[in-house]
Amino acid sequence: MPDHLHHSTPALTSRAYEGVGDLSKMLDLLMEARSQTNDWHCAHVGELLWNYLVLSSHLPEREHIRLWHDRDGKLAGYALLREGPSVDWEVLPRYEGAGIEEGALAWVEGRLAELRARDPEKWKKKLGTGARADDAQRIAFLDEHGFHPGKYAEVNMIRSLEGPIPAATVPAGYVLRAVEAKDVHSRAEAERVVWFPCSDGDISDENYARLMTLPGYVRELDLAAVTPDGIVASNLNAWPDPVNRIGDFGPVGTRAEHRRKGLQRALLLEGMRRLKEHGMERVCVSTGVENLAAQALYLSVGFQIVNRWQEWVQGE
């Protein structure tokens, strides 16, 4: 048994999410957990921030985020019930197997019963979650609690930022720069155009403006290729984990009429350069196993496939 699982059962309490101060502690939890495990044991802070934005843009946060604290008041774990429905939970390594996972699932099932009674059409689908291929403990937990592998999967990719990074070649007619306040409408619109009707694409201008105020957001790492008339043609959000010196890319997108021009390649290279300036030593990105075009692009700029995330669905 790993050292971090040798513990007496702690006194854990749970409560609803109360505000951005809790979000900051959730980010701290992810960075601490990664420092004690590996690059794939838990979500990256960038994944949490984007998932939080989408959740809080559509759902009441207090009803869809649950926190667990130890006897000293330290955040030990959290769970998010998102649209889909899907659940994400993260637990500090020393508290894995201490009951938070069961508590999170029980909380989600209780909330889903309430939501389905209130709006059966919106919440009718089976509960989903996910696990990485090398996370035997989570896979065993899901199997024991009635989940089975679903249809969707992603490849997880990583690239070292050591050594020189090729210069970004920006196609004629575009400017590559950080997103500014004046770009909020076009940046949010780009998200809607590329990803809607997925919930990730249902982002208003006001929602995106709020993202820019959250802890963990770094404006210099929110990149876009912009046309002369101010249209965000392509975008890339880069996120730093300053504790573990690993960056993350996502979301990554380009409007259809601006594709096949090299914009995403330029943004990826510039994102790497800026992450390196912010002290990152490596960067990760994920994409669907069937999205061969995205995989080819990431491989072409030095990423390697090192892991796989698999959807798991509850019930038969």
How would you name each of these model-derived features?
Residues 1-7, 79-172, 311-314:
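Acyl-donor-binding surface of acyltransferase catalytic domains
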Residues 1-51, 168-202, 231:
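Short amphipathic alpha-helix that is part of the acyltransferase structural core
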Residues 15-23, 31-118, 131, 228, ...:
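Conserved donor-binding loop and adjoining core beta-sheet/short helix segment
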Residues 77, 151-153, 233-234, 307:
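A structural microfeature
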Residues 97-114, 254, 260-277, 282, ...:
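Conserved acetyl-CoA-binding loop-helix of GNAT-fold acetyltransferases
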Residues 127-129, 249, 283-287:
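Conserved hydrophobic beta-strand within the GNAT/NAT acetyltransferase core sheet
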Residues 138, 142, 298, 303:
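Conserved active-site tyrosine of GNAT-family acetyltransferases
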Residues 163-247:
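Flexible, substrate/cofactor-facing loop regions flanked by secondary structure
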